[in-house]
Amino acid sequence: MKTQCASTWLLGMTLILCSVHIYSLRRCLISVDMRLIEKSFHEIKRAMQTKDTFKNVTILSLENLRSIKPGDVCCMTNNLLTFYRDRVFQDHQERSLEVLRRISSIANSFLCVQKSLERCQVHRQCNCSQEATNATRIIHDNYNQLEVSSAALKSLGELNILLAWIDRNHLETPAA
């Protein structure tokens, strides 16, 4: 009887440890202070959203991001950061030096996040599923429907959606 209880206990502990390990593999933790990125965004948010003339259009859909499966989070995050780096930050034309400094700070922070993701990809090989590829394509299609400068401005104004999603999916939750 003791052997059976010990075997059951051992099996139970093994399953618990495996589930914890699998859960940790779902997430790719990033080593960037998101509060600094959020602070820079909040300092330019009003300027971006005031200039936005397409109030009823969205490029970065919260519903689209919520549909991302845990196994695609690393891939989708990398896709979104690449989108912002290669399209939004490049396409945006800004006259205010202060806003430019804030955008540059955000862009540099995104590069640091991407470096963290590269390390994660090396160790965990986070590949993109078809759903993640489709979600990325939808964002690019939404962006392409607007004139370039309007699309860049709109995307900058929607950074809070991306930042909240990154917070929810990449930051380590404190132990209870």
UniProtKB/Swiss-Prot annotation:
PANTHER family in the record: INTERLEUKIN-19 (PTHR48482:SF3), INTERLEUKIN-19-RELATED (PTHR48482)
Protein purpose: Cytokine that functions as an anti-inflammatory and proangiogenic factor. Polarizes adaptive immunity to an anti-inflammatory phenotype through induction of T-helper 2 responses by both down-regulation of IFN-gamma and up-regulation of IL4 and IL5. Produced by osteocytes, stimulates granulopoiesis and neutrophil formation. Exerts its biological effect through a receptor complex consisting of a heterodimer of IL20RA and IL20RB. In turn, activates the Janus kinase (JAK) and signal transducer and activator of transcription (STAT) pathway, and importantly, STAT3.
GO cellular component, one term: extracellular space
Gene Ontology annotations of biological process type: apoptotic process; negative regulation of extrinsic apoptotic signaling pathway; negative regulation of low-density lipoprotein particle clearance; positive regulation of apoptotic signaling pathway; positive regulation of intrinsic apoptotic signaling pathway; reactive oxygen species metabolic process
Disulphide bridges, residue numbers: 28-120, 74-126, 75-128
Keyword Signal assigned: yes
Pfam families (UniProt xref): IL10 (PF00726)
Subcellular locations according to the entry: Secreted
Family: Belongs to the IL-10 family.
Endpoints of the signal sequence: 1-24
Annotated keywords: Apoptosis, Cytokine, Disulfide bond, Glycoprotein, Secreted, Signal
Phenotype on disruption: IL19-deficient mice are more susceptible to innate-mediated colitis and develop more severe inflammation in response to injury. In addition, mice respond to vascular endothelial growth factor (VEGF) significantly less than wild-type mice.
Principal location class: secreted
Keyword Signal carried by entry: yes
One function term, GO molecular function aspect: cytokine activity
Protein name as catalogued: Interleukin-19
Cited Gene3D superfamilies: 1.20.1250.10
Glycan-carrying positions: 56, 127, 134
